[in-house]
Amino acid sequence: PCTSTTNMAQSTHKRKAANGHLGITEESRMLNSILIKMVSEIDTELRTGLRFVFTIEQPKSADVTEIPALKMLTEREDVYRAEFSMCWFGVPYQKHTYIWTNIKPLADALNQRRCSKDNPCAYFNRHEQVKGNSDECTPFPPQLCALIKDHVACHVSKRRFEPYCLPCA
């Protein structure tokens, strides 16, 4: 369902302000219901589960941050949105991507990996074009997976010996 938010798919899914950025297709509705459930669970865990960490990835598009469920996440002070380019992680295409997380060092590390003239990746000025079906761009590059894994492991290991208790009401 993530493809319902990509720039290439907007002529089909039509996530526009006029429909509250919810889109018009069954795929859009499916992603919306997944996001609503996921954000509800994340919100509950962030309020009650002190040892909870998460990441949500979505392709960057003009209006993806306006999808109501993702907008709710962005408005939280303990959630950080990172914007980065997949080409920084060893793939030849420049897929601009968002990740929402509650691990600030991860968001900071990802934000440093936006491909541009001032911050070029190894493929700068010779990125491969993705036309039509974007399925080949869907898998996370191993370097990105390793970065996320390292930050999650570091974050949870620092908290391993903290006493676990719920916040006072």
Question: What residue ranges belong to the model's regions?
Answer:
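Conserved active-site and SAM-binding loop architecture
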Residues: P1-A169
